[in-house]
């Protein structure tokens, strides 16, 4: 690890932000701090993550939503002080890292399948076979 990476990792730990582990295809709610005149409020921006850029302190992600029939994309810096919180609403099952093809689609063709959690019975059976193999 070079000096710049070390400084960035120290800065990330100093910020103490808890960023959930999300990926492209996930539906997230980003709570953004907005200043209007002398008032400060939190604005929720809900949409699908279409891209994620992992660059340490300079990491960013792009969220797309359809508002009044128009597609709106917004790019957020992951460690920005303007982001109050990030909440994952739904996990999406996609096979691409960048979902830019969603820009050309609308309606049913723009839907993303939901990633279902592994069944408990399947996990128990898998754990049981691993224990018998180790014995």
Curated annotation (Swiss-Prot):
Keywords: Ribonucleoprotein, Ribosomal protein. Residues 108-135 are annotated as: Disordered. GO terms for molecular function: structural constituent of ribosome. Residues 108-117 have a biased composition (Basic and acidic residues). It comes from the Bacteria. One of its GO terms (cellular component) is cytosolic large ribosomal subunit. Pfam families: Ribosomal_L19. Gene3D superfamilies: 2.30.30.790. GO terms for biological process: translation. PANTHER family: LARGE RIBOSOMAL SUBUNIT PROTEIN BL19M (PTHR15680:SF9), RIBOSOMAL PROTEIN L19 (PTHR15680). Belongs to the bacterial ribosomal protein bL19 family. This protein is located at the 30S-50S ribosomal subunit interface and may play a role in the structure and function of the aminoacyl-tRNA binding site. This is Large ribosomal subunit protein bL19. It comes from Nitrosospira multiformis (strain ATCC 25196 / NCIMB 11849 / C 71). The gene is rplS.
């Amino acid at each position: 690890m070079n000096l710049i990476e070390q400084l960035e990792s120290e800065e990330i730990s100093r910020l103490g932000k808890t960023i959930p582990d999300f990926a492209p295809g996930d539906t997230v709610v980003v709570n953004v701090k907005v200043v209007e005149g002398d008032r400060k409020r939190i604005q929720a921006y809900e949409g699908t993550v279409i891209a994620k850029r992992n660059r340490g302190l300079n990491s960013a992600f792009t969220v797309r939503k359809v508002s009044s029939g128009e597609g709106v994309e917004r790019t957020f810096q992951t460690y920005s002080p303007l982001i109050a919180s990030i909440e994952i609403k739904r996990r999406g099952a996609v096979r691409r890292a960048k979902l830019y093809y969603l820009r050309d689609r609308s309606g049913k063709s723009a839907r993303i399948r939901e990633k279902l959690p592994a069944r408990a019975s399947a996990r128990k059976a898998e754990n049981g076979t691993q224990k018998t193999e180790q014995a």
